[in-house]
Amino acid sequence: MMRLDKYLAERTGMTRSESRKAITKGRVMVAGKICRKADTQLDETAAQIALDGAPLAGEYKKYVYIMLNKPEGVVSASRDKRDTTVVDLVAADYPRRELFPAGRLDKTSTGFVLLTDDGALAHDILAPAHHVDKQYLVTLDTPLTEEMRRGFAAGVTPADGEHLAPAEAEPAGDDPCTVRVTLHQGVYHQIKRMFGVYDAGVNTLRRLSIGGVALDETLAPGEYRELTEEERKQLQN
């Protein structure tokens, strides 16, 4: 259940104050009858609401799931005092949503960032116990070696003493410095720390997929779209 003023704000882009004024002025109809009470409780999945005589367009979405192709120089956060955030890039289209990134990429990294307001799904994606695979395209400052591949497969322990879980590092194309990395559970700076064990530096890092959902290659850096129903179900499963 949801208050009428909150529902109207989310559906129209109004502020809560604007939606309350519209309701008290008799501009809003619920199930064909004028309603002037902003605190009226609705079943948001089945509500029949009209504003100024016109039914609200589209359907109500309890949560949204957005695939963003993160460009370099943007931070993976909901808000930041100095830098542009991934949420800033989509905010104009989702003004009343409290979005956050389900997982982070460094400021210099690029690729697939999932933005949502579904905390349960984000937890499932990020929880180490759930082992949601994430795939990356990495360029190193030195060629990939068999020692690195074996080390990734077994898991490594950097100088800080934290054991990093097994992952996969495989050649990606003809360039020996270009590597496809698959993480089965992610921790802070895992890829850079794992390659650091072999004195290999990461020049670029681009996330290609999350949980089997691949970045839409038609999205230019900074562009985004909502997940399809099939993609959303794939993440939830």
PLM ranges: what are they?
Residues 2-237:
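Basic, flexible Lys/Arg- and Gly-enriched helix-loop patches that mediate nucleic-acid binding at interfaces
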